[in-house]
């Protein structure tokens, strides 16, 4: 298990775990400066998008833009046990992120997230699913 400040460990893991995508969460905390460092040091291939970690939606979107410009994944994270009206999944749809992280649809917040994705698919029937095949390392 890597510590949230173990930059060298993440670099080694990214290099050695060739069949695994390493995604920053506590390492990058949706912080554009930390995401840039993680990219420059080849520490992760993407990040968990949580605007509450960095503090503003503006900074979170800036991190997403940096990731997109550098072919990194942005993965919005809907909080299990969080509020029903959490906008993180909505932001992910609006930003056209590659994936989202959610728990099983057992509580109101996860059902809300699934419904958000369902509505987006209904409103955009021509939208293509993200092709993960170039990222599969098997």
Annotate each predicted stretch with a short phrase.
Residues 1-138:
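Catalytic core of soluble alpha/beta enzymes
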């Amino acid at each position: 298990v890597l510590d949230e400040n173990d930059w060298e460990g993440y670099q080694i893991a990214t290099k050695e775990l060739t069949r695994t995508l390493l995604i920053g969460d506590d390492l990058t905390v949706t912080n554009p400066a930390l995401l840039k460092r993680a990219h420059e040091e080849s520490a992760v291939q993407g990040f968990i998008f949580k605007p509450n970690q960095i503090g503003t939606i503006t900074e979170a979107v800036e991190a997403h833009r940096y990731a997109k410009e550098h072919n990194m994944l942005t993965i919005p994270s809907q909080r299990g046990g969080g509020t029903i009206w959490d906008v993180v999944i909505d932001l992910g749809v609006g930003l056209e992120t590659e994936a989202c992280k959610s728990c099983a649809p057992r509580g109101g917040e996860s059902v809300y997230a699934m419904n958000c994705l369902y509505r987006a698919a209904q409103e955009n029937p021509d939208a293509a699913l993200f092709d993960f095949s170039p990222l599969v390392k098997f």
